[in-house]
Amino acid sequence: MSIRIKIDKLRQIVAYFSEFSEEVSINVDSTDELMYIFAALGGSVNIWAIIPLSASVFYRGAENIVFNLPVSKVKSCLCSFHNDAIIDIEPDLENNLVKLSSYHVVSVDCNKELMPIRTDTTICLSIDQKKSYVFNFHKYEEKCCGRTVIHLEWLLGFIKCISQHQHLTIMFKDDNIIMKTPGNTDAFSREYSMTECSQELQKFSFKIAISSLNKLRGFKKRVNVFETRIVMDNDDNILGMLFSDRVQSFKINIFMAFLD
């Protein structure tokens, strides 16, 4: 079982995720024809991309598969492949490896006769395959009780001014979401109108770590605004905030849990 992927698509993925983590977990769902890429950033922050299987990302297998990919190592070695290469990614779960392979054929004039010359490249990279994550992505899309749009650069400017604090209080009032620093002295507050806000939600307040919000800084060059949702599970437990956007050709989700 392997994934065949165009090198341009692989470059997008590894360039993006290597800014946040040295490795990611890849989950291929052959039934839904989707590939999920997941990384845990710490501090109750998870990031994942959802990529449809297509001509540029093709799965050669019938069963679902989960494996780890060392994105930092892959990013460093992609210069070994031709710019038009289609790369096979084949995990070796038993030996804690992942293999990248590709070939390229060029025609060379040899005594006025074109001769095909084939170049094969294979790279084996070590990575612990025993700790792959099976992440329930659908859990965070089951229910939404609040929705707004947040301009990333303005949010980053706001939290830069409050770096002396450890968390923000999240409140809801008059169909607005309010982010406020603790106390009344030297207090900062940011308010967003919401396109969706349940009446039940406006009875609660939560806390979110500023260190978690700071992890959005890695998106600064790629994202202008995030669709932001307050998400619940099927038992109506409010889980946290889900930031979503489409980056290049794939969808990105970042989930941040509210503090207890």
UniProtKB/Swiss-Prot annotation:
Keywords: Activator, Transcription, Transcription regulation. Coiled coil: none annotated. GO terms for biological process: regulation of DNA-templated transcription. Pfam families: Pox_TAP (PF03355). Induction: Expressed in the intermediate phase of the viral replicative cycle. Transmembrane segments: none annotated. InterPro entries: Pox_TAP. It comes from the Viruses. Belongs to the chordopoxvirinae VLTF-1 family. Interacts with the late transcription factors VLTF-2 and VLTF-3. Interacts with the late transcription elongation factor VLTF-4. Interacts with itself. Associates with RNA polymerase to initiate transcription from late gene promoters. This is Late transcription factor 1. It comes from Variola virus (isolate Human/India/Ind3/1967) (VARV).
